[in-house]
């Protein structure tokens, strides 16, 4: 990996987990996917030579995942060409995988912040892919609902730590769905 930042949690993930063929991911019990190689656990979805995807440790909803380039880049304008191309390639793939796992009719946001002033918390480019579940209603009226949706869209709102067992199960489902999506694309 080019220019890893030893203090960056996403560089740690990118340097810990080796790439594997996304059409045939290792079994969940494989040491290649061991979530406890990092602390907190990493629930890997995808690991290619250029990008990694994993579940957010403080998800806004089930299956909230992050897709990031393997090399360290603080802002989208800093991402080298090959990882940038891979980000564009795999955003639709992980989106389709998410729909396969959560069901047709699932809505989702794709959010990417550039810099602290834009709300970026980890200084390594990453795209949030956030499913929007239909049963997350607001306690109040239309204004509260509008405010809640606006807040949640930009990564704020109710968040809980991802449970390790829940993370392992969801990551396995999403890895399988990514493989299915890519296998289906290969037939087209």
Give each language-model segment a name.
Residues 2-7, 132-188:
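Conserved His + Asp/Glu catalytic blocks
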Residues 1-71, 168, 172-188:
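Active-site microenvironments that recognize anionic phosphate/pyrophosphate groups
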Residues 115-138:
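Histidine-centered divalent-metal-coordination microenvironment in nucleic-acid enzymes
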Residues 46-48, 60-62, 82, 89-91, ...:
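Short connector loops at helix/strand junctions that flank enzyme active sites
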Residues 82-101, 164-173:
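Long, well-ordered alpha-helical scaffolding segments within enzyme catalytic domains
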Residues 102-118:
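A short glycine-rich, hydrophobically flanked beta-strand micro-motif that places a catalytic Asp/Glu
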